[in-house]
Regions:
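Ankyrin-repeat inter-repeat connecting loop/turn
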Residues: 556-557, 590, 623-624, 659
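Conserved hydrophobic site in ankyrin repeats
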Residues: 530-531, 583, 616, 652
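Start-of-repeat signature of ankyrin repeats
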Residues: 511, 564, 597, 629-633
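Accessory alpha-helical/coil subdomains and C-terminal extensions
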Residues: 7, 13, 35, 40-149, ...
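Conserved ankyrin/ankyrin-like repeat signature
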Residues: 526, 578-579, 611-612, 647-648
Length: 661
């Protein structure tokens, strides 16, 4: 779903990788602060004064005015620091490590490329938590896809020291990234992780599990050719990732490369030299970027749990991958399965088959009986394991768990994640391995229902219109005359006919209006009708309901055209608790902002709906952005303090505000 505010805030976590490397005598090497300096010098990535071509080419008149103003004249590097550019806001960023090149907690100055760079002051605010204010960069203003208003993306770059080649990434680094996101979760709208390509799919898979109850966009990206080269893919990859992160709420850990956004736990690196380096053979892309940015909303996961976001900070290192090969012996298998190994990803032949050697099967069975979790996936790039063959059934009988169509990277990181949870037994881990926790595998396809007949589709549309009439007239007090039409008169006219596409289009036009009307009336029956009619898609991928109506973010997040408010905004504003609970259970996004930059939590707190504030906070909502910066929250709290209204102050406190006496 598109975020609504004049500016979106994105934290870029720069871990290293080819994207920011330079050529040296030893080949490509990372260079500290090169990436930030380069992005700051390029107008498409940093246009604080809005004096670039990108900010002034929305119309011919705008371009001509800009061209004649003299602002289009190239500026020398000596004059690049203008008052307006140097006074850009800094953004408060937290990290699990000291921020800066020296690792000290005081301001530092060091020489870089014959220039002196002053590092921001870094403070240790708690055990293992450091805080600093980083200079921000801001993109040119651009039109939000699908809407008429414009937005800029303001971002800060949290650069690791040292920068890592992705081949040196370890499990502790995955946990560190997750911790950085958790520390900054309430301060930013989205997160972009810059990473080397070699192990990017391992990191994206791991983060998909470590980031529990995620409600914001997290995108990993990088490049095959560094930004320092004239011809590169770094510009498109980074700009595309920033554009998606700043304009859409896609609450998943994803990977963006070569104009495509993939689910992070569905990809593998397929080429070391193509710009199209990543493939997702068993799941379609979430976003395709061409002339238009096309989001495949029906495939985007929706958060339906009423829990706040948290980062899990432990992975079990006692896992490994074993690729079967013809002639493998039981001794080889036992060597892999020996302690301290607790989990094995077994890459099997074809659809889950293995050699029938008794010593190999005995090694697998003994390990499973001893508590080792073995997950079978296919060596094939595309496809899934199944029990159709006898050679696959023997593995299942030995205790091996089918892993469906998971990638090797996903299976390994999922196994490591589950084994790191002390509350889970080996049997529970085996059970969870075969279930889609983050959309990482395709569940068995249920039998398809019979195609609806023309009469069924007419009935569905009639039901929709009946609900619309009922809700529209529910507040009227005057009697409405009833018009009775006899059966003969009804039969005299032909029934309303039309194609399935026409009916779907009609429903798509009516459902958002009906949805908002039901929520405003606190009509849970009408709300449930809308959700069912829209074919609410669960995380398992099973579509329920009678119609397939595609609305960005799902019908549960449909926006009012005038105010940009979602149904959750309306329910929170009206104090309709039952609708709030139903919307959250159906995947409503708590971080959506309307045209004024407000969240549902802000409206609930402003209206004094304490119960709804508690419910939204428990679901992960937080105040931020324009609500704090424009002074809306501060003014409301100060007015309550001045009036001595402790009840109102308490509601804002429960919403996360710390009143100043």
């Amino acid at each position: 779903m598109e975020t609504r505010s004049d500016e979106a805030r994105v934290l870029v976590i720069y871990t290293g990788g080819t994207i920011g490397m330079l050529v040296s005598s030893r080949g490509y090497v990372p260079e500290p602060y090169f990436l930030t300096d380069t992005l700051r010098s390029q107008k498409r990535f940093h246009d604080p004064l809005q004096d670039s071509l990108f900010s002034n080419a929305a119309s011919v008149e705008g371009y001509r005015e800009w061209s004649n103003s003299g602002k289009s004249t190239p500026i020398s590097s000596d004059n690049v620091t203008t008052p307006g550019a140097s006074n850009q806001p800094t953004l408060l960023v937290r990290s699990s490590r000291p921020v800066g090149s020296t690792g000290t907690l005081s301001p530092s100055i060091f020489s870089h490329s014959q220039r002196v760079i002053e590092q921001p002051e870094c403070r240790n605010v708690a055990d293992g938590i450091y805080e600093t204010r980083l200079p921000s960069l801001v993109t040119p203003r651009s039109v939000v896809p699908g809407h008429g208003h414009t937005k800029r993306i303001r971002y800060a770059i949290l650069e690791w020291n040292p920068l890592l080649d992705s081949s040196n990434m370890e499990m502790d680094d995955w946990i560190r990234i997750a911790a950085e996101i958790e520390l900054n979760y309430t301060s930013f709208d989205a997160f972009v992780v810059l990473h080397g390509t070699d192990t990017m799919s391992y990191t994206s898979s791991a983060l998909s599990f470590l980031l529990e109850d995620l409600g914001k966009t997290v995108i990993l990206t990088g490049a095959q050719i560094p930004l320092s080269q004239l011809r590169n893919d770094a510009v498109d990859n980074l700009l595309g990732a920033l554009s998606i992160a700043g304009n859409y709420i896609i609450p998943e850990c994803s990977l963006y490369f070569n104009h495509t956004l993939y689910r992070g736990n569905r990809v593998s690196k397929a080429s070391s030299y193509d710009l199209n380096a990543f493939h997702s053979p068993n799941f379609p892309p979430l976003v395709n970027v061409g002339i238009d940015i096309v989001v495949n909303w029906n495939d985007v996961l929706r958060q339906t749990s009423l829990r706040r976001f948290r980062a899990h900070k432990e992975m079990s290192p006692h896992v490994a991958t074993l690729r079967l090969f013809p002639g493998m012996t039981g001794a080889t298998a036992r060597a892999f399965l020996a302690p301290p190994t607790r989990g094995i990803v077994l890459e099997t032949f074809g659809a889950g088959n293995a050699s029938q050697r008794p010593d190999v099967l005995a090694a697998f069975k003994d390990a499973c009986d001893g508590g080792v979790v073995i997950v079978a996936i296919s060596q094939c790039i595309k496809g899934s394991v199944s029990g159709d063959y006898e050679t696959g059934q023997t593995l299942i009988q030995a205790g091996v768990v089918p892993g469906g169509d998971m990638t090797p990277e996903c299976a390994l990181t999922k196994l490591s994640y589950l084994l790191a949870k002390p509350e889970l037994t080996a049997a529970e881990v085996r059970s969870l391995i075969g279930l889609p926790l983050r959309g990482e595998l395709t569940p068995p396809v249920p039998s398809l229902p019979a195609a609806p007949s023309s009469d069924d589709m007419n009935t569905d549309l009639s039901g929709l219109l009946s609900q619309l009439v009922r809700l529209s007239s529910s507040a009227r007090k005057t009697d409405i005359p009833q018009i009775v039409i006899g059966e003969e008169a009804q039969d005299a006219a032909a029934p309303w006919s039309g194609t399935a596409a026409e009916r779907a289009s009609t429903e798509a036009a009516l459902l958002p209006f009906l949805m908002h009307l039901a929520v405003a009336r606190d009509d849970v029956e009408g709300l449930e009708f809308c959700l069912t009619s829209a074919g609410t898609t669960s995380c398992s991928g099973v579509t329920e309901g009678t119609a397939e109506v595609v609305v960005p973010g799902g019908i549960v997040n449909c926006l009012d055209a005038g105010s940009g408010r979602s149904p959750l905004h309306v329910a929170a504003l009206k104090g309709n608790m039952r609708c709030v609970e139903k919307l959250l259970e159906s995947g409503a996004l708590v971080h959506l902002r309307d045209e004024l930059g407000h969240t549902a939590l802000y409206y609930a707190a402003r209206q004094g709906h304490a119960g709804i504030v508690d419910t939204l906070v428990s679901a992960g909502a937080n105040l931020g952005g324009m609500e704090n910066e424009a002074g809306y929250v501060g003014l409301a709290v100060q007015n309550a303090v001045n009036a001595g209204n402790e009840a109102v102050v308490e509601i804002w406190r429960r919403a996360g505000v710390k009143p100043v006496d």
